[in-house]
Amino acid sequence: MTVDISRATADELRSIAERGAVELDGASAQELLQWTEDTFGDGASAATGDRNGYIVASNMQDGVLVHLAAQVHPGVDVLFLDTGYHFPETIGTRDAVEQVYGVNVINARALASVAEQDVAEGKDLFARDPNRCCALRKVAPLKQTLSGYSAWVTGIRRVEAPTRANAPLISFDEAFGLVKINPIAPWSDEEMQNYIDTNSILVNPLVDEGYPSIGCAPCTSKPAPGSDPRSGRWAGASKTECGLHAS
């Protein structure tokens, strides 16, 4: 039976993810993105209120995933969580990626500005309760944006942190209720760098300044040499993930 992706139920999307995970076990990033396009690319009509097809998430550390996706779907939707706390270099990278790769950047923002949050929650919530800050400025806007799509593509990789060591290529994201594709999950740091060099990929200038994992400015520091690349995120706290990749 053919499933109307734009109106697919959670159970139907879960079944699609399960079949895809089996059929594309060991597939390349390009093959995974082509499957994503073939399965979800037609999307739906926004005028009907149905779900769109899929969106590609990027933290704008580099343009690798966006470059890969744009070759399969020129003008693809790219999700950027504009928390209000980003480094200027990250915002600059976002703008350059949109222009150079010709994609449609969707800026997901919290309902409250940083100033409004300071009034409601107290100044510098990130320092007192980083989990709540991430919930308000990342998780909630992400959930709202993803509710309009049937699938999302992320750039998480297994080598980035122990919490991501078993990241699947395709799964059903129970937290957000849609299919999740991680096409570069198996890539090593060397493979990433080779793709960047070979294709002259845009890279956030902060990477060359010693930031291998870039998030919000107040919660990002340079990790010690040889340590977990994500150890510079929320340094000094037990927190290691912002809640976007819990499933």
Swiss-Prot record:
EC number(s) recorded for this UniProt protein: 1.8.4.10
Transmembrane segments: none
Nucleotide-binding as UniProt keyword: no
Any Gene Ontology CC annotation: cytoplasm
Cofactor(s) it depends on: [4Fe-4S] cluster
Predominant location category: cytoplasm
Pathway: Sulfur metabolism; hydrogen sulfide biosynthesis; sulfite from sulfate
Reactions performed catalytically: [thioredoxin]-disulfide + sulfite + AMP + 2 H(+) = adenosine 5'-phosphosulfate + [thioredoxin]-dithiol
Source superkingdom: Bacteria
GO molecular function: 4 iron, 4 sulfur cluster binding; adenylyl-sulfate reductase (thioredoxin) activity; metal ion binding; phosphoadenylyl-sulfate reductase (thioredoxin) activity
Residue positions of the active site: 242
InterPro entries, sorted: APS_reductase (IPR011798), PAPS/APS_Rdtase (IPR004511), PAPS_reduct_dom (IPR002500), Rossmann-like_a/b/a_fold (IPR014729)
UniProt-listed GO biological process terms: cysteine biosynthetic process; hydrogen sulfide biosynthetic process; sulfate assimilation, phosphoadenylyl sulfate reduction by phosphoadenylyl-sulfate reductase (thioredoxin)
Stretches the record annotates as Disordered: 222-247
One Pfam family hit: PAPS_reduct
Key words of the record: Cytoplasm, Iron, Iron-sulfur, Metal-binding, Oxidoreductase
Binding positions for [4Fe-4S] cluster per the UniProt entry: 133-134, 216, 219
CC cofactor note: Binds 1 [4Fe-4S] cluster per subunit.
NCBIfam families for this protein: APS_reductase, cysH, PRK02090.1
Name of protein: Adenosine 5'-phosphosulfate reductase
Species of provenance: Rhodococcus erythropolis (strain PR4 / NBRC 100887)
